[in-house]
Regions:
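Extracellular loop-to-transmembrane helix junctions
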Residues: 2-24, 193-207, 302-310
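Transmembrane alpha-helical segments of multi-pass small-molecule transport proteins
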Residues: 10-16, 53-58, 78-102, 119-121, ...
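Membrane-interface interhelical connector segments
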Residues: 39, 147-152, 213-236
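Membrane-water interface regions at transmembrane-helix termini and the short interhelical loops
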Residues: 71-78, 93-114, 184-187, 284-299
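Transmembrane-helix boundary/entry motifs in multi-pass membrane transporters
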Residues: 2-7, 30-61, 78-84, 227-242, ...
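Hydrophobic, membrane-embedded alpha-helices of multi-pass small-molecule transporters
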Residues: 1, 10-11, 57-61, 65, ...
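Hydrophobic alpha-helical segments and their helix-loop junctions in multi-pass secondary transporters
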Residues: 95, 99, 117-148, 312-329
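Extracellular/periplasmic helix-exit of transmembrane alpha-helices
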Residues: 21-27, 131-135, 165-166, 197-229
């Protein structure tokens, strides 16, 4: 949103890069049939660098957990007027307890609200656009002034780098997941169609929310959770309901993040697993409670986004030189799978 109309070009770049990366991970998983999803790093980068990237991905996931805790704190303070640290501390305590006790099924059940949150955010964005359509010119001017004054932070110096960084940090989350989706897919074409539809839907949602934020910037620029302010402008009850859904969404995201970090080093249920979960959960909570949510997002996601861009650049080179295709053909032959060019 801070790049104004240039941000729309950034969204198109995001769509192209998300589609490319998603299809790449999917195809690697489909043909290679990894025993463990993280083996994709070694395929893409070689054994030594792949191992480094694998451990870095775990570190990034830990940092993402800290961002979730900061987000819980920001939501609790902004909408529920909770004392500082209370919302984030409660969220961290519940997440640590759930991971230590292995109550992942609770997350599986509540996790089904994810699409509801996305749909609600899109609806709020559309209503906000309709309510503020006549403010486009003045809102664009104000956005430029706020960016120039530093009151609105930008992730990168230009929209192209911002788009690449955004795809980069999301990509680190999605690598192993999409490789596993490809591994289990019965039809490669159906799985590829799913990636395309997902990238399209995600990009449309970004477009809607970006326009909504620009049009409502006079009310949102000093808010850590802008969509909550937009919801409140529509109806206070809607904002409360959406806040609850956000907190549940943060919970269902934080638990798998913390579980992934601990599970990478220790077997679930062991004493070391529980001890490490407690330590990692508390350290992550301290970081999340100490730094402001918007500042933490700009630090964690932007820095990791640039690192993800390096991996993305290597993937493009790997595809352009034909190395990716060669590896998939060899894997298809090894696993008795018909290669689809």
């Amino acid at each position: 949103s801070s790049y104004r109309l240039y941000g729309l070009i950034g969204i198109m770049i995001c769509f192209g890069l998300f589609t490319f990366a998603g299809l790449s991970f999917l195809n690697d998983g489909y043909y290679s049939k990894f025993e463990k999803p993280n083996e994709i790093y070694k395929l893409m980068c070689g054994n030594k660098i792949g191992r480094i990237v694998d451990y870095y991905a775990v570190f990034f996931i830990f940092l993402s957990y800290t961002v979730m805790i900061a987000g819980a704190q920001a939501t609790a303070v902004q909408h529920f007027n909770a004392p500082k640290y209370v919302g984030g501390a409660i969220m961290a305590a519940v997440c640590i307890l759930v991971v230590m006790l292995g109550l992942g099924k609770i997350v599986d059940v509540i996790g089904k609200i994810g699409p509801v949150i996305a749909i609600m955010a899109i609806i709020i964005g559309l209503i906000s656009i309709l309510m503020n359509m006549d403010k486009l010119g003045s809102s664009l001017d104000l956005m430029g002034q706020l960016v120039d004054s530093g009151k609105v932070k930008v992730a990168s110096s230009n929209f192209f780098l911002s788009a690449g960084s955004y795809v980069g940090f999301n990509m680190i989350w999605l690598v192993a997941f999409l490789a596993e989706v490809g591994n289990k897919a019965k039809s490669l074409k159906d799985a590829e169609a799913g990636v395309f539809v997902g990238a399209t839907g995600f990009s449309v949602a970004i477009f809607i929310m970006s326009i909504a934020i620009i049009l409502s910037i006079p009310d949102l620029y000093d808010s850590q959770i802008p969509v909550l302010v937009s919801a409140g402008k529509i109806n206070p009850i809607l904002a409360t309901v959406f806040s609850i859904f956000i907190m549940l969404g943060i919970f269902t995201t934080s638990v798998p993040l913390l579980w992934t970090v601990t599970g990478r080093f220790f077997d679930e249920g062991t004493k070391k697993y529980k001890t490490f979960t407690l330590i990692a959960g508390v350290v992550g909570a301290v970081i999340g409670l100490t730094l402001e949510f918007d500042s933490l997002v700009n630090i964690v996601y932007v820095v990791n986004g640039y690192i993800g861009m390096v991996l993305l650049a290597w993937m493009i080179i790997r595809s352009a030189t034909g190395k990716a295709k060669k590896q998939r053909m060899e894997a298809a032959q090894r696993n008795n799978i018909e290669f689809e060019d």
